Design a protein with these regions (language model features):
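ATP-dependent carboxylate/acyl-activation modules
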Residues: 1-186
Length: 186
């Protein structure tokens, strides 16, 4: 068990802070400050998972959760919006991996899981030609896939809903909420 007070010394200066002893239970979600006071049970579970994740993540963190799992975590950035963007991009990539374009990819037999996962990451990202170029795709796919266009990605991401967002601190500006909404946070 960690000490109740954590101490770190940096260049002769001692910093100390108390251990995070936040109890994560239904009481945590009792003070709803938004206009919509209805939180479905599934959202409470996702929010609890976000808070548990954040409790054990580096300070200044944001977590997106959906369906009982963390789908994007942004930690240790210098500003809250950078955490929100980083975690949101990870959440977007999680959702893009479930698109019909990705689910329909036909991989060569006996491809290793890591190679398949890396190919998917490249396919949904900006470096898609690394896996679609002649001489490359033949080692990964049975059939050369079509490019997953920016317009197709945007259309698929627009269907992302039911995502919960947790933060270990206050969002000082609306830009965080706007960015989170683009990744399905309601």
């Amino acid at each position: 068990v960690p000490e109740p007070i954590e101490r770190k010394q940096v260049f002769g200066v001692t910093f100390e802070q108390g251990r995070n002893e936040l109890v994560i239970d239904d009481k945590l979600f009792s003070n709803i400050v938004t206009e919509n006071k209805n939180i479905p049970e599934s959202a409470k579970i996702d929010l609890a998972i976000a808070m548990i994740t954040l409790k054990y993540t580096q300070s200044n963190s944001v977590a997106y959760t959906c369906g009982g799992q963390a789908i994007g975590i942004g930690a240790g950035q210098q500003s809250r919006i950078h955490c929100t963007r980083l975690a949101g991009t990870k959440a977007d990539n999680w959702y893009l991996r479930q698109s019909p374009q990705v689910m329909g990819l036909q991989f060569v037999d006996n491809i290793r899981r890591a190679d398949r996962d890396n190919a998917i990451d490249l396919y949904i990202g900006e470096d898609y030609m690394d896996v679609l170029a002649d001489g490359a795709w033949e080692n990964i796919f049975k059939v050369k896939p079509a490019v997953f266009t920016t317009e197709e990605k945007k259309a698929w991401l627009a269907t992302m809903k039911g995502v919960a967002l947790g933060s270990d601190a206050f969002f000082p500006f609306g830009d965080n909420i706007e960015r989170a909404h683009r990744s399905g946070v309601e």
